[in-house]
């Protein structure tokens, strides 16, 4: 295993590498030291339940889940066999895909945090203006009167693509004026889709951090504008954290035990950190020390792992060590991590891995061939973590995971893909 200094050197060399967090401690102790609590996740979960009648009405594809924005958990045994045979993996137990790539409304994990942040702001405005009480039927938010009210307000967000889609789609459905500030990495089809929904898209020839800053500045000019801050938002974070509770129920439905003798290993693609950080926080709340969460980042944009391993959090960016921040995994093309997320997860995330663009496409193609499932390149990052961890015999032994490896449940969190147009899918699969 590499120490943190050696790992940063591997990052500089653009090597696919692994970092195991030396600061991870007992979940109970680590969670007790954090300002966010189970009560915060309770409140977020309850708010999503209150808005479910509205979501069901406006987004009929959510009807099967009663207006909840949720995705399937699918065992991918053929992909597990492929990884073992073709990549030298030693994955025992079961391998699952958490298909946030197929989440309704926005087709990515950002439908969790992004939609929740919009709904939280919406409820705050509605309560302050006495439009509703919490016990009311929130399907009234779909009426013309409510849409007219929210049309007085504007939402701003900086995005590489998927967060902009979730906030743009949900914001427009509620009647807001929405402006998405897009970095140079954003895919054209995502901009086109937003504009088709009536969302204003401002394009910048610079990276994600610059787009976020521009969004922050624009929102500050108007008291009726609200900036959804991907770098610092507690609301986004809590929206993602709710996912862990839903996952717990899905695992129980499939008779998957999670405890010390049946460890849960979760591999999550990471950009600025909000989605993986929130999910990690939720998983540790639900499963404690039985959950082991690993972040996966591109070799050119490993911002969160760089911040965690160096201890500098958002005081360092990938360009500081000679990397470009450019990657085909557009959702992960972030150069500087969230300091808020880094501080929150520094004692609960188990580690992380970096992956080359080449291997993202290899795994994208293999998943489609073996399971007939399509995800976008960013969503494939977790496979590299599962493969690499399975080969780290010293770490597995020292961490105690090796003793229960045969009983492990592995979850690769697929973060996006459902909205990718057919022409783009064909290009990805041909790459």
Annotated model-derived regions:
Residues 1-431:
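PLP-dependent amino-acid enzyme catalytic core
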């Amino acid at each position: 295993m590499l120490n943190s200094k050696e790992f940063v050197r591997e990052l500089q060399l653009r090597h696919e590498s692994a970092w195991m967090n030396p600061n991870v401690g007992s979940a109970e102790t680590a969670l007790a030291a954090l300002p966010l609590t189970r009560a915060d996740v309770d409140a977020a979960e309850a708010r999503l339940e209150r808005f479910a009648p509205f979501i069901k009405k406006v987004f009929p594809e959510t009807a099967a889940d009663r207006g909840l924005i949720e995705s399937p958990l699918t065992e991918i045994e053929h992909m597990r066999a492929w990884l073992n045979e073709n990549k030298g993996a030693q994955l025992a137990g079961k391998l699952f895909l958490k298909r946030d790539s197929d989440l309704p409304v926005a087709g990515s994990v950002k439908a969790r945090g992004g939609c929740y942040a919009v709904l939280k702001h919406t409820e705050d405005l509605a309560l302050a203006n006495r439009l509703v009480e919490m016990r009311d039927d929130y399907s009234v938010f779909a009426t013309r009167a409510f849409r007219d009210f929210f049309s007085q307000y504007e939402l701003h967000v900086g995005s590489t693509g998927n967060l902009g889609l979730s906030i743009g789609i949900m914001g427009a459905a509620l009647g807001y004026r929405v402006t998405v500030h897009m970095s140079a990495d954003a895919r054209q089809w995502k901009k086109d889709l937003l504009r088709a929904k009536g969302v204003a898209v401002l394009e910048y020839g610079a990276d994600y951090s610059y787009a976020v800053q521009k969004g922050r500045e624009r929102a500050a000019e108007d008291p009726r504008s609200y900036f959804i801050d991907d770098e610092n938002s507690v609301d986004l974070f809590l929206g993602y954290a709710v996912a862990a509770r839903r996952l717990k129920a899905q695992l129980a439905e499939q008779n998957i035990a999670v405890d010390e003798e049946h460890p849960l290993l979760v591999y999550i693609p990471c950009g600025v950190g909000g989605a993986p950080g929130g999910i990690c926080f939720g998983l540790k709340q639900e499963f404690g020390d039985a959950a082991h969460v690993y972040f996966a980042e591109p070799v050119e944009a490993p911002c969160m792992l760089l911040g965690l391993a160096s201890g500098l959090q958002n005081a360092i960016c990938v360009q500081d060590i000679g990397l470009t921040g450019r990657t085909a995994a557009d959702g992960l093309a972030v150069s500087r991590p969230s300091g808020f997320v880094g501080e929150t997860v520094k004692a609960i995330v188990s580690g992380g891995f970096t992956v080359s663009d080449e291997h993202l496409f290899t795994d994208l193609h293999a998943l489609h061939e073996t399971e007939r499932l399509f995800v976008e390149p960013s969503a494939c990052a977790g496979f590299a973590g599962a493969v690499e961890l399975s080969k780290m015999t010293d770490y597995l032994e020292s961490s105690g995971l090796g003793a229960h490896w045969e009983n492990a449940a592995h979850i690769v969190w697929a973060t996006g893909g459902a909205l990718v147009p057919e022409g783009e899918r064909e290009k990805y699969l041909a790459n």
